[in-house]
């Protein structure tokens, strides 16, 4: 085997053994020693927790107000029916949620294939039993909400957020979105030419039928690669720029009225009214200033002209005035 001792072997997909439509074994080799467990454990965790899928989240059954009740003519109690509904393997194309209906009457089993749905919905286990009707006069009708999601979301996590809007009789269901039912991996010895210290990774996986096992492996590997992309070139990691804080007020408003270079008469009148800063002045109205002793229309006109030359005017509204720096003074 040629190549530098520092080079890593690049594994290849050796074999995909399709045990059944929902069960497959995927073999990957050769791997450097230890990488079998490194990759196997990472892929296993992603396959179990991060594969998106669809699950039943809410159910409404005619004549049923809560999950701790029973329904006449139905062998199972409501809790058992909800548990059976969790076992539905549903695939939805192009939608994040759908409402399915189920209406059945007459003695016999009620199965997933009895559910009414459109072409965007596929039920992978139509023979899955939901409940049993005990006599010819028994009937059951329900509306089933199916949502797309990821991982496991217990019903208790949605109770408080939906409590005000949820009508009586709408039953929440623990949602297991992952289409992967079981995943295990093993690491065996592999050999390439004279090297016998290599790993062979065998991933044994079962799905609920809504996702092909081979496709599941590809998706998990893609997720892992995308998460590691940030480490490939750390120079691409952008350091957030520190935003320059904008002053709360225009600096000119913080300057003393003396900077306006008013006549002595006008300046003294303003100081007598405790108007020390330009920000204090612009908040006054013409009427208020005319009430100031010894300040007439001539002085008012002067003040207005000086303010206008600086893009200011009387009667302005300043939120949070005065600023802390002035208030402390």
Swiss-Prot record:
Catalytic reaction annotation: RNA(n) + a ribonucleoside 5'-triphosphate = RNA(n+1) + diphosphate
Keyword Nucleotide-binding: no
Positions of region (Alpha C-terminal domain (alpha-CTD)): 249-329
Gene Ontology terms: cellular component: cytoplasm; DNA-directed RNA polymerase complex
Positions in coiled-coil regions: none
Pfam families: RNA_pol_A_bac, RNA_pol_A_CTD, RNA_pol_L
EC class of the enzyme, as a word: transferase
EC number: 2.7.7.6
Signal in keyword set: no
Sequence segments annotated as region (Alpha N-terminal domain (alpha-NTD)): 1-235
Superkingdom, natural source: Bacteria
Example of a GO MF term: DNA binding
Keywords attached to this entry: DNA-directed RNA polymerase, Nucleotidyltransferase, Transcription, Transferase
GO BP annotations listed: DNA-templated transcription
Domain remark text: The N-terminal domain is essential for RNAP assembly and basal transcription, whereas the C-terminal domain is involved in interaction with transcriptional regulators and with upstream promoter elements.
Subunit description: Homodimer. The RNAP catalytic core consists of 2 alpha, 1 beta, 1 beta' and 1 omega subunit. When a sigma factor is associated with the core the holoenzyme is formed, which can initiate transcription.
Family: Belongs to the RNA polymerase alpha chain family.
Function: DNA-dependent RNA polymerase catalyzes the transcription of DNA into RNA using the four ribonucleoside triphosphates as substrates.
NCBIfam families tied to this protein: PRK05182.1-2 (NF003513), PRK05182.2-5 (NF003519), rpoA (TIGR02027)
The name this protein goes by in its record: DNA-directed RNA polymerase subunit alpha
Species assigned in the record: Photobacterium profundum (strain SS9)
């Amino acid at each position: 085997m040629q190549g530098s001792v520092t080079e890593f072997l690049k594994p290849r997909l050796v074999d995909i053994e399709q045990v059944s439509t929902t069960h497959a074994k995927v073999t990957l080799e050769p791997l450097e020693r230890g990488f079998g467990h490194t990759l196997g454990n990472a892929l296993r965790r992603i396959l179990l927790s991060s594969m998106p899928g669809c699950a039943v989240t809410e159910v409404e059954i005619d004549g049923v107000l809560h999950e701790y009740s029973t329904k006449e003519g139905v062998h199972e109690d409501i809790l058992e029916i909800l548990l059976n509904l969790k076992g539905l393997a549903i695939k939805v194309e192009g939608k994040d949620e759908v409402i399915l209906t189920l209406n059945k009457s007459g003695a016999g089993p009620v199965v997933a294939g009895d559910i009414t749905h459109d072409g965007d919905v596929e039920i992978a286990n139509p023979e899955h039993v939901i409940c049993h009707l005990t006599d010819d006069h028994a009937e059951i009708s329900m509306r089933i909400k199916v949502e797309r999601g990821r991982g496991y979301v217990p019903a208790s996590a949605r109770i408080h957020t939906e409590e005000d809007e949820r009508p009586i009789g709408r039953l929440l269901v623990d949602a297991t979105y992952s289409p992967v039912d079981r995943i295990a991996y093993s690491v065996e010895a592999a050999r390439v030419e004279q090297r016998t210290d290599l790993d062979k990774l065998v991933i044994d996986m079962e799905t609920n039928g809504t996702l092909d096992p081979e496709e599941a492996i590809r998706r998990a590997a893609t997720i892992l690669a995308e998460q590691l992309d940030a480490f490939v070139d750390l120079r691409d990691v952008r350091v957030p720029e520190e935003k320059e804080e904008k002053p709360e007020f225009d600096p000119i408003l913080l300057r003393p009225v003396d900077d306006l270079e008013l006549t002595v008469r006008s300046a003294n009148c303003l100081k007598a009214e405790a108007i020390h800063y330009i920000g204090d002045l612009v908040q006054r109205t013409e009427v208020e200033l005319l009430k100031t002793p010894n300040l007439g229309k001539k002085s008012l006109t002067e003040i207005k002209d000086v303010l206008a030359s600086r893009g200011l005017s009387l009667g302005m509204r300043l939120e949070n005035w005065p600023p802390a720096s002035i208030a402390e003074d």
